[in-house]
Amino acid sequence: MGQTLSEPVVDKTSSEGEDDCCIYGVSAMQGWRISMEDAHAAVLDLHAKYTSPEETSTDPAKRLAFFGVYDGHGGDKVALFAGENVHKIVAKQDSFAKGDIEQALKDGFLATDRAILEDPKYEEEVSGCTAAVSVISKHKIWVANAGDSRSVLGVKGRAKPLSFDHKPQNEGEKARISAAGGFVDFGRVNGNLALSRAIGDFEFKKSPELAPEQQIVTAYPDVTVHELSDDDEFLVIACDGIWDCQSSQAVVEFVRRGIAAKQELYRICENMMDNCLASNSETGGVGCDNMTMIIIGLLNGRTKEECGDAAEFRGPGIRNQFEENPDDYDMENDRARGFSVRSGRIILLGDGTELVPDQNDEELFDQTEEDRDLPSQVQRELPDSARNEREGTPGPQSKTDATSKSEEGSSASTSESTVTPAGSSTSGAPEKSTS
């Protein structure tokens, strides 16, 4: 657990934007930590902003949006660099121009590492960051992940993980770490870093004889490709400041309640962060971290209002019906909460309903069982052939899976954007700061 303040910083930096493909809201909060080390990016039209005019398509069906969350550790410099540059670097890859978005994301993550190494300003830099990003077209989502920030898709009220957390104790990750000359002790790389993949962290990338994806810690991402359907409602990308406190399913249900209650997406993010904020700084780090959360609503040809109506009446996840008059619900929820008391924490459901649980913070935020099952959830969403095509470092897998895979291998509209270091002002979309 990092150093904490005597009182949390609950001011939030929030923004929103939309086009005919998707609508998003994002918010970031420093919380109990002594500094803000998160960054994020939101770009509604990646082609228009960062490719040459001849490469830019005016066809809305070919428009690509980009969203990313970068959770820094050991300082904020690498996270800020990532938030400002990853999307630009991805858009400059040859594979991006050829329409191979999956390869562009892989190449772009590694190119970001190289760009930092080649910049004299970062010669002695020791910090690093996670990277959870998504590129969204009208018909498809690409999710790239390095670290333990997470991307979760809401499908008719059910959580579908599109990434898995890269932890050193995972068998596939541990195998790479050991092969590169490192070790895992107490769930940490070389007894130090709690992640097995990250941008930066160059002290773990010093083996010149090894390729970048084979280093003790690598920036090489896993990429999940998802074909969109009418059942897909929204994507949530957030740092572990959220996921350490809430399960993926709980977040999806919370977001869906807010959408059904006609709340703005950035407001749902703010309410979720208030829920996750620890009532004090003695919870062992749970609820004390920086928090950043992006919700991307997938319009699928619908208006924002139609998406709200669909969330209210179809599928699981909504546990009560809402009256037509939204004035019956507390939509703003601006008053201070949570951190001022140790017991009687007020939990806000996504529709503004208040709940006072009996559990303490540690019991309330215990997601051990879900985290244990997360790798298998992601694997179930991918055919074996898709995972076999992933070169470099394998994703989470059992020893049996690893053996069988080894045997198989031997035998065979107007553009709008915001790019925001969390905690600073935004551009291209209205900024909202609340406390």
From Swiss-Prot:
Composition skew (Basic and acidic residues), residue ranges: 381-392
Pfam families from the UniProt entry: PP2C
Residue ranges, annotated region (Disordered): 366-435
UniProt effect for mutating residue 71 to A: Decreases activity
Catalytic activity: O-phospho-L-seryl-[protein] + H2O = L-seryl-[protein] + phosphate; O-phospho-L-threonyl-[protein] + H2O = L-threonyl-[protein] + phosphate
Localization: Cytoplasm; Nucleus
Superkingdom of origin: Eukaryota
Entry's Gene Ontology cellular component terms: cytoplasm; nucleus
Named cofactor requirement(s): Mg(2+); Mn(2+)
InterPro entries reported in the protein's UniProt record: PP2C (IPR015655), PP2C_BS (IPR000222), PPM-type-like_dom_sf (IPR036457), PPM-type_phosphatase-like_dom (IPR001932)
Enzyme Commission (EC) number: 3.1.3.16
GO biological process: negative regulation of protein targeting to mitochondrion
Function in brief: Dephosphorylating regulator for many key proteins. Dephosphorylates phosphoglycerate kinase pgk1 at least on 'Ser-203' to negatively regulate targeting of pgk1 to the mitochondrion, thereby negatively regulating production of acetyl-CoA and consequently aflatoxin biosynthesis.
PANTHER family cross-referenced by the UniProt entry: AT28366P-RELATED, PROTEIN PHOSPHATASE 2C
UniProt name for this protein: Protein phosphatase 2C homolog 2
